[in-house]
């Protein structure tokens, strides 16, 4: 969309999953067209959101995170066709060294009514997995946490669906617009506008949903470059506020019928941790 506006209620920076999901939900409050503006320097799903693995799961160790993820899974389930969401479930398959931690995750899932089953013991785990794949042969597995909800979504398609939902609610998404700074109030440090290479937008609120680029906006706002974190030694240590870790995820093209279950269905998303030796069969 061209013709950058000069005013908006909310300006959201970033056209990935954070920016667009925020725009979509805020559009339920700000219902007048043009009140919400999304700025994206390239294209929606051009950054990390477009290369993420797309797994939808609730396999997290923190209780608060688990409740949040249960809510998020329900959003994916609300429109699986648009989000290209495949509700095949998720499996955490682990050796004995992880048994206690995975059992804790299961108990927390059970406490919030999240549908999952937990299989314990090497013999029972092998039996359970062979009920899904009759050629299952992983050794040393003593726990299987099978989340019946969750699965996976196609990354770029799901982000484009968020863009479509936001657009339908009157959100304006402007692509090819680079944010270069912020405008402050005359008598305060409050941000009153977003400065771009295409002009300035006056606004009431700003949401920065820029993923790995958040550091740049942090610096534009002249916020602290370091913070203090308590170490294992009990002492406070000064560390950089932002540290960028580059994660690469590979995508393999396989036949659509590859790794089907015994019933010929799509398998759950499977995560296997193992301390057993790995051997090639080729």
What are these regions (language model features)?
Residues 53-132, 141:
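Dinucleotide-binding Rossmann-like beta1-alpha1 core, especially the glycine-rich loop
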Residues 27-49:
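Glycine-rich FAD pyrophosphate-binding loop
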Residues 24, 28, 164, 168, ...:
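Short, well-ordered alpha-helices that flank and scaffold nucleotide-derived cofactor binding pockets
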Residues 167-180:
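A conserved beta-strand/loop element that lines the FAD pocket in flavoprotein oxidoreductases
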Residues 21, 57, 182-190, 196-282:
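Flavin-dependent oxidoreductases
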Residues 3-18, 37:
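Beta1/beta-strand and adjacent pyrophosphate-binding region of the FAD-binding site
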Residues 18, 44, 213:
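Conserved Rossmann-like nucleotide-cofactor binding loop
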Residues 5-7, 84-92, 106-108, 112, ...:
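Helix-loop-beta segment of a Rossmann-like dinucleotide-binding subdomain
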